[in-house]
Amino acid sequence: MAEEKLLVKRDGEFCYPIYFENDFSFLSQALTDEGLAGKSMCIVSDSTVAPLYADQVKAELLKVTDHVYQFTFPAGEAHKNLDTVQDLFQCLIENGLDRKSLVVALGGGVTGDLSGFGAAAYLRGIDFIQIPTTLLAQVDSSVGGKTGVDFRQFKNMVGAFHQPRLVYMNMATLQSLPEREFGCGMGEILKTGLICDKDFFDFVCANYKVIRTMDPEMLAVMIRKCCAIKAGVVERDPKEQGERALLNLGHTIGHAVEKLMNFNLLHGQCVGIGLGAAAAISRERGLLTNGEYEQICHSLKLYGLPLYVEGLSPRDILAATKKDKKMEQGQIKFILMDGLGKSFIDKTVSDQELLVGIHAICR
């Protein structure tokens, strides 16, 4: 693929580029172009991704620096915590990384969140870059500068806004994704269309057969469009003071389910379940027709996402929902849909309405 990139802005000024490639061969040039050559670098990856791609990435980094280190942690959301961050700090300290060094996040959303938070906190903040290898990370967690880790049973409770210096997407890494992981990314993509772009939502639904074959050209079109939509939202509201909160559609109840399931369901699966709950509440308010509600549920099924969760008490889900980190003065900032492709923030969703959504997803 010829070099393609999307420029993400903040306050109208250039912030960082997102590179779209089909291999790692342009990474060294991208680092040079962004003024990152010569830095000491530490690749952060998990035990699943490191054996697949760490050597390839290290070879590219060694073209622009003599000092490349590696930190690998056990894969899974259960290790996205302060204990792993402490281990990362120990690695950075032992290898002498300083304020001019660079953290290289290689992997999915867990790796990106953890690496970014570690970079934000280490020596009061050092540079980092994102090399997302899952669809979920490419379209969601690698764009926007949100970083963080889970604290005990509370998801993303400790974190910081820390923008990467660049994002480098090798879309060929998607070909190694298990189908379940691919579906998780599609949940976030469907969410993006439902928030603010009905045409994009319709496109993703209409082309599901080609998309599910992981056709490279179709994936490239879809990923670039999704990143452009999210980047636009982030540019206008980098620290989630308003519009950016819309990106949390499906996440409030979704995070509660994820926590109660002890992370045995993947994040994207829980977001899909949360989308169904938000759609049910929106329908209850008369904001979605029955047909639109069914269309949302059908879109999730097209990509193999679960619509229901088993074995959880609706009251337990409600209690967990009300511990969401986005609570403000005892009120949930809930995202509702007003038709397909339009959403808004609502602070008046009652417990009774929440239970309507929760009962819609419980079996």
Q: At which residue positions do the language-model features occur?
A:
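Short glycine/serine/threonine-rich phosphate/pyrophosphate-binding segments
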Residues: V110-F117, Q138, A256
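A glycine/threonine-rich phosphate-anchoring loop and its flanking beta-alpha core
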Residues: F117-V210
